[in-house]
């Protein structure tokens, strides 16, 4: 009996796994729908890596307002270096509530990038959670979408994974973070040559001292255009050096914060390095190669082509919604105008609706002249027409005799006939 019960349970689980076609991650304020939580690509064969899905509102996640705004931070967690970096921020403004979809038909969208990750993009309004153009092995890792609504005090965190396999070196990226000990002082900076001075706080078990250090980052001809900096920093310390540099924040799981998702959920507001990102439109207008060391013109063209989907979606919305609505409004205006015109003709221009003109010969009464001047309308009753007929008899038709009496020959003949009658 127990064996049959186990087989029946396994059959139910297998049928549920076969019938399930999507994954839904439920957050506090919104949720994420996707068909697969991870995707892989082969370097250098594959030209793109795309993860499809969208954000939505489930039951109990309804918005308190008709229009809302929000910010999405795309964060890359590198498995090899065990650190995370904010690579893109997308700001949506004045978004209406369209069914249960999130960030659809927004009035304004502003996208900003960190220049080393210009090939990596997210566009949730077009059902694209992650799009990597020409993926490389260094693009492997976890990509986290941190969604913050303006009216919500906390943020929601959703994650997907990307794996890029290198056929030349026959290496496979680790699906989980490495267990080796990584010093929390390791950060990677990709920036041109500059001098800066920053305050770094060093904490020990007994005392906490503040030291001021001067560092110089020199651009090297390496493939990553990066320089490894080593400073003594406490765990999860946010450090910004210079005006264009963006450090990779080291994260170490602990009993209090076991995962990176809980670490990002515990942070309030926007991440401080968001102000260092460059708007996409300004980045595309930049022609000097010194400002974009790792992005080629082909990458910019690919990114422009990828982000043009938002314009295509907006044009499709205009063609499907605005144009039919305008046609319906025009038809309604035509119908209303016809109704108003008929009412005016019926009630205000009754004299002009129907007139009968007759000759004025013979004696006509005042009632007849009034009837001829302003004839009865189409809506006049039969009784009013009968009253007009009885009050004024019809004018007799003029006979041809009147014309004969006016002839002198006929008058002479009439006189002769009368004389003959008198003589007889």
UniProtKB/Swiss-Prot annotation:
Q: Where is the composition biased (Low complexity)?
A: 203-223
GO CC annotations on file: host cell; host cell Golgi membrane; host cell junction; membrane; viral envelope; virion membrane
Q: Where in the cell is it found?
A: Virion membrane; Host cell membrane; Host cell junction; Host Golgi apparatus membrane
Residue numbers spanned by region Disordered: 192-223, 287-306, 377-408
Q: Where are the annotated glycans?
A: 35, 67, 78, 121, 131, 236, 307
Transmembrane regions listed in the UniProt entry: 320-340
Intravirion compartment segments: 341-424
Q: Which domain of life is it from?
A: Viruses
Assembly description = Interacts with gE.
Q: Which family does it belong to?
A: Belongs to the alphaherpesvirinae glycoprotein I family.
Q: What is this protein called?
A: Envelope glycoprotein I
Q: What organism is the protein native to?
A: Equine herpesvirus 1 (strain Ab4p)
Phylogenetic lineage:
Viruses, Duplodnaviria, Heunggongvirae, Peploviricota, Herviviricetes
